């Protein structure tokens, strides 16, 4: 079997709590593999991906914005800081607009 890490090991490597990794997995719909006992099994590729997610979160990206970036994550990792800032502002604004539209739609259905 390929070398991997349990969630407790992965959380220590990434310096986040276990529940944060589970939350990111759920919200970003990440296909984290499981071992034969059904426990999460983080390979180096998942650790690298989650490290990038953590870095983007620390730079102010919302999870919904990060989710939109997942297909192009490798390109995003190599962006210069100014372009990354512009992308963050654009995507976070888009996420906010979508949330506001959703909230307005919910209010209309109640009235």
Regions found by a protein language model. Name each.
Residues 45-48, 52-104:
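Charged, helix-prone or intrinsically disordered regulatory segments positioned adjacent to compact structured domains
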Residues 108-111:
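Conserved small/polar residues in nucleotide/adenosyl-binding loops
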